[in-house]
Regions:
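Sec-dependent bacterial lipoprotein signal peptides
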Residues: 1-18
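Long, charged/polar, soluble alpha-helical segments
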Residues: 18-119
């Protein structure tokens, strides 16, 4: 009877430790994407996406500070998407990929642009 309980406690303890690791990895990935966007000149050529990426990464760090790792992961992923969109827009090598990345960064603005009503 005690063995299943101990196994359950061990698994729960192991899973509890995954949140900070995954969040840290996502934040580091977003920071790399932001640096790549900076190198491409996104601060001047893709101001909207650049600013969004930086605000999302700040919010990710804030949520991690409150131990809300799920929100931290979500905001870090959003920061990566926006930084990627900023980099693609700044380099202007593939306009279709840049537009797709921009829509991933801000899907609500893509809906407005296409004429869909706002919910």
């Amino acid at each position: 009877m005690k063995q299943p309980f101990l196994l359950l406690v061990a698994v729960a303890g192991a899973l509890a430790g995954c949140g900070p690791v995954r969040t840290t990895a996502n934040i580091l990935d977003a920071e790399v994407q932001i640096q790549a966007a900076r190198t491409a000149g996104a601060e001047e050529k893709a101001t909207y996406e650049w600013t969004a990426a930086n605000l999302y990464i700040e919010k990710a760090r804030e949520e991690v500070g409150y131990s809300d790792y799920q929100a931290g992961v979500s905001f870090a992923e959003k920061a990566s998407q926006c930084a990627n969109a900023a980099r693609l827009k700044a380099t202007n090598k593939d306009p279709e990929a840049a537009e797709k990345a921009r829509r991933e960064c801000h899907p609500e603005t893509a809906e407005q642009k296409s004429g869909s009503p706002n919910p």
